[in-house]
């Protein structure tokens, strides 16, 4: 493909590292609820250097981060060069770790969940499903920074070891009763916030694990839609005043300034060394299909990166 030419108000970024996201795979398979117009070059985030500032006030050679949602979801990130709106560009320090910075979108999602999806909740205790995943590990770090006691659910000893290393209490869902362990670890009080990307039948159990006035925050449906009468389940726990809220980054589409606040917060934490994005396999850009196969196996720990 030819190197794109930046239009008015755009810059050209030469890629250093490209983050691979789960919804890249959903777009490829046609299962993403917000499908873009086809043909479409996927990708969600990139770090790199300005190759052509195009009179925007940015500087050639400057280290930068850019996310797809800041560039009007135009895609094009699985490439050596990206033409992006100057307003989508986030400058990074010259000595920033550009590999780890290419995994920051997970933290932006985690910030959106905690700061807006869970608005009104100040969790003393939070439970995270899939705590060894990309968003899960980010939630552990942000939860701990917020002063919460964090309990992470994972499905293997290896993943539980990672959850523990990241500073959370781990529950092995393949060996333990999740509800029983949450009850034990919270002294019977339950969790103020439960972050759930699974949906399916897990919601019913989550309702029994909530503290009074607690919230189950749903941000995915990997397990499909729930089959139970969820309202009946919630009514059975009515003395706890349980709540369920659904979140997506598209919740910010009509208020992008809120998403900007999340990104700004994450970049500040990254620059200050307060968060440590976890990296997984790093593959050549030409092996994007292999990266998607790794994601589909759902055994990868850490963010998959592509390198031009």
Across the structure, where does each feature detected by a protein language model lie?
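Glycine-rich phosphate-binding loop and adjacent beta-alpha segment
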Residues: 201-274, 308
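Short glycine-centered segments of the SAM/dcSAM-binding site in methyltransferase folds
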Residues: 63, 125, 149, 214-215, ...
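Short amphipathic alpha-helix with an adjacent loop that forms part of the alpha/beta core around
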Residues: 178-188
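Glycine-rich beta-strand-centered segment in the early N-terminal region that forms part
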Residues: 2-20, 31-70
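Short, well-ordered loop/turn sites that connect or cap secondary structure elements
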Residues: 57-58, 120, 210
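C-terminal capping/lid region of NAD(P)-dependent oxidoreductase domains
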Residues: 267-268, 272-282, 289-308
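Mid-domain Rossmann-like dinucleotide-binding core that forms the NAD(H)/NADP(H) cofactor-binding site
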Residues: 100-176
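N-terminal Rossmann-like NAD(P) cofactor-binding module of classical short-chain dehydrogenase/reductase
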Residues: 65, 127, 194-195, 217
């Amino acid at each position: 493909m030819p190197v794109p030419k930046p239009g008015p108000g755009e810059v050209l970024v030469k890629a250093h590292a490209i983050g691979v996201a789960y919804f890249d795979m959903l777009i490829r398979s046609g299962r993403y609820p917000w499908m873009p117009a086809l043909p479409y070059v996927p990708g969600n985030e990139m770090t790199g250097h300005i190759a052509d500032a195009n009179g925007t006030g940015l500087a050639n050679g400057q280290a930068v981060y850019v996310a797809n949602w800041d560039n009007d979801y135009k895609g094009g990130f699985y490439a050596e060069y990206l033409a992006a709106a100057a307003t989508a560009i986030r400058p990074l320090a010259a000595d920033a770790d550009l590999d780890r910075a290419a995994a920051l979108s997970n933290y932006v999602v985690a910030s959106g969940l905690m700061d807006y999806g869970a608005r009104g909740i100040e969790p003393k205790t939070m439970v995270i499903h899939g705590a060894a995943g990309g968003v899960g590990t980010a939630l552990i770090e942000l939860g701990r920074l917020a002063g919460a006691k964090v309990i992470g659910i994972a499905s293997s000893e290896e993943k539980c070891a990672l959850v523990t290393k990241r500073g959370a209490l781990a529950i092995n869902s393949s060996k333990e009763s999740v509800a029983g362990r949450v009850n034990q670890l919270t002294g019977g009080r339950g969790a103020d916030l439960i972050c759930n990307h699974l949906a399916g039948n897990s919601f019913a159990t989550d309702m029994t694990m909530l503290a009074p006035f607690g919230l189950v925050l749903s941000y995915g449906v990997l397990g499909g839609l729930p089959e139970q009468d969820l309202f009946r389940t919630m009514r059975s726990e009515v003395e706890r005043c349980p709540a369920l809220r659904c979140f997506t980054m598209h919740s910010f589409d009509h208020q992008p300034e809120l998403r900007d606040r999340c990104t700004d917060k994450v970049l500040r934490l990254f620059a200050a060394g307060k968060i440590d994005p976890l990296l997984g396999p790093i593959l050549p850009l030409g092996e994007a299909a292999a990266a998607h196969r790794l994601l589909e196996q759902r055994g990868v720990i850490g963010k998959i990166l592509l390198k031009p």
